[in-house]
Amino acid sequence: RIRNTKRVFYSSSACMYPEYNQLEPENPNLKEDSAYPAQPDSEYGWEKLFSERLYLAYHRNKGLDVRIARFHNIFGPLGTWCGGREKAPASMCRKVAEAKDGDEIEVWGDGLQTRSFLYVDECVEGVMRLMDSPDFRGPVNIGSDEMVTINHLAEMAIKISGKNLSIKNVHVKQIGVRGRNSDNKLIKQNLGWGPEMKLIDGMTKTYQWINTQVNSNKTQPENSIQI
């Protein structure tokens, strides 16, 4: 406001949605108006929720023109792909790229937990639509509504690779919520936007890039970005 900034974008997250709406793998409720009563399942989700409120308070009290998007698992080439901070698509691509024919790849939990994943190029398009909107500020979901199980995601990476691999489900205490999928009705209604790229196509591009990194014996590249 002091610098007379015309418009500000805040990248929120689907992690701000209440845990009780994400207990069923097949039927998560992540409509924008389902955020309250608040009950995110992590400190990260609470931080995103409170930050949304802070930006909206600046809008109400100071007239700051804000735009808020709730991202749903953005992925693609040049993203983080190793080290434990990568998203599931990159993790599966890396595990498959590192594996040899006949190997197993590990999937945490029973693999029946569901998620949706949005390719980075489409995320950029959604953000641009939101920033160019004269009066729609959100909060609004920017994500894919193509929901898959994590086992299916792993199978997809294996199919892309052409390798003969199997999946080993590993019991762990914490695997996150059981179901998460972007509800895109609001953004389609207000901005006419919806993702067009199929998950298999985004995974193919991502696998090809990560496979190159693995076969070049690289660690996390310096020019990668966390998405």
PLM regions with names:
Residues T5, W46, V120:
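Catalytic Tyr-X3-Lys loop
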